[in-house]
Amino acid sequence: MLLVVDVGNTNTVFGIFENGNKIPLFHKRTVTRKDRTSDELGLFFRGFLREFKIENEMITGGIYSSVVPTLNPILDRMFQDWFKIEAIRVHYQMKLPFSISYPRPYEIGADRLVNAATCAIDFPGKSIIIDLGTATTFCVVNEKPEYLGGVIAPGLKVSMDALTRNTSQLPPIVFQSPGKILGDSTIESIQAGFFFGWIGLLEGIIREIKKDKGQDYQVIGTGGLVTVIDAAHPGIFDKIDPLLTLRGLQILHLMNS
């Protein structure tokens, strides 16, 4: 069995793959804690695995992507001590299913490399990959496949938290469509601003990318809020895959083990 871990600034998502299946047997999302020790992580993962009757020795491979560099040695130690394996860490110099047309490839986040890997294998052709995470990232991969670059915008939750934190009378809200552009209350007005504002951001950046690179790019969405946006405002994404990052980790493990 393969344990894959995607460490983001806000959340960590992990899952178990078995026998080369493209869909994880199990997966879970938890808050990223930057103060955890390797033993605390080991205990956490052991508890998760035992929920599904999986013992540590059944894990024969491990890979992780991380945008929190301070956690990298802790993850390495956790895999070594608790699973007796050397985990693969995603980086731009590993074997990738695409080439990189980027003057400073070392600046590309591990999460973006993983997402591009899934698109190169599972969604061949010209793709715009949008990941709605702590940051909202757009990555562009052409038909060769070649990583061309991307766009990084603020994340939705970060922006919502900033508005609440920096104002005295605006309450926190749940992100959802208010159903109309003009709100009848403060909460509805904030919801309208974030919902339609984010729709405009997504559609506007997609439009500019297609204007620059061509109209025949498919748009693939992933991340925690992708299903919410797709259900309330269909048509932005040609395909959505909330587990796209975990699948990318599986692909890169197969290529590099």
Swiss-Prot record:
The record's annotation in CDD domains points to: ASKHA_NBD_PanK-III
Catalyzed chemical reaction(s): (R)-pantothenate + ATP = (R)-4'-phosphopantothenate + ADP + H(+)
Relay the cofactor remark from the entry. A monovalent cation. Ammonium or potassium.
Q: Broadest EC class?
A: transferase
Name the record gives this protein: Type III pantothenate kinase
Q: Could you name the Gene Ontology cellular component terms for this entry? A: cytoplasm
Q: In which pathway does it act?
A: Cofactor biosynthesis; coenzyme A biosynthesis; CoA from (R)-pantothenate: step 1/5
* Annotated EC: 2.7.1.33
Q: How does it assemble?
A: Homodimer.
User: Which terms does the UniProt entry file under GO BP?
Assistant: coenzyme A biosynthetic process
Q: Which HAMAP family match?
A: Pantothen_kinase_3
User: Which sites are catalytic?
Assistant: 111 (proton acceptor)
Q: Which Pfam families match?
A: Pan_kinase (PF03309)
**What's its job?**
Catalyzes the phosphorylation of pantothenate (Pan), the first step in CoA biosynthesis.
- Mind telling me which NCBIfam families this protein's record contains? baf, PRK13318.1-6, PRK13321.1
Does the keyword Cell membrane belong to this entry? no
